[in-house]
C-alpha cells in the first residue's frame, strides 16, 4: 500500500532545503506518478512538480513554464526513501546534492 509522506531535505552545501510531498510504495521507493515540492531558498520559494514514470527510473523536475521535454533530472526514488539518504538534481548549472533529514508519514483512516 502506498503511503503519502512529506520529506525535508537539506542541500549538502548549505543555504537551502527541499520540502517534498510524494507517495512511497510498500518497498520504500518513490511511487510512480506526479508529485509536488518546493525549494526553500530562505527569502524565496521555488515550487516544482516532479514525475516518476517507472519503478527504477530517475525523476524529472519541472518548474513554472517548462515543457514536458525540458525537465531537470533528479535521482530521488532510485534508492529507498529514508532519513540520511542522498539524492541529486542535475540542471544546466551542474549537480545539486541533498540529504533527507526527516520524513513525516500522513496517516489515512
Predicted segments with their positions:
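N-terminal intrinsically disordered, low-complexity, charge/repeat-rich segments that act as generic
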Residues: 1-33
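A generic structural signal for short, solvent-exposed coil/turn residues
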Residues: 12-14, 42, 53, 81, ...
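Short beta-strand/loop turn elements enriched in aromatics
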Residues: 37-71
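A structural detector for beta-sheet-dominated domains
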Residues: 8-10, 21-23, 51, 62-64, ...
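A short, compositionally biased
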Residues: 1-4, 55-57, 80-85
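Short, exposed beta-strand/loop patches in secreted or surface proteins that constitute
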Residues: 22, 48-54, 78-80
Amino acid at each position: 500500500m502506498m503511503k503519502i509522506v512529506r520529506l525535508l531535505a537539506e542541500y549538502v552545501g548549505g543555504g537551502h532545503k527541499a520540502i517534498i510531498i510524494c507517495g512511497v510504495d510498500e518497498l520504500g521507493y518513490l511511487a510512480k506518478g506526479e508529485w509536488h515540492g518546493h525549494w526553500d531558498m530562505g527569502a524565496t520559494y521555488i515550487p516544482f512538480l516532479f514525475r516518476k514514470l517507472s519503478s527504477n527510473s530517475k525523476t524529472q523536475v519541472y518548474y513554472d513554464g517548462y515543457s514536458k521535454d525540458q525537465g531537470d533530472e533528479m535521482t530521488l526514488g532510485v534508492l529507498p526513501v529514508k532519513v540520511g539518504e542522498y539524492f541529486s538534481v542535475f540542471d544546466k548549472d551542474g549537480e545539486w546534492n541533498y540529504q533527507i533529514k526527516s520524513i513525516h508519514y500522513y496517516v489515512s483512516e
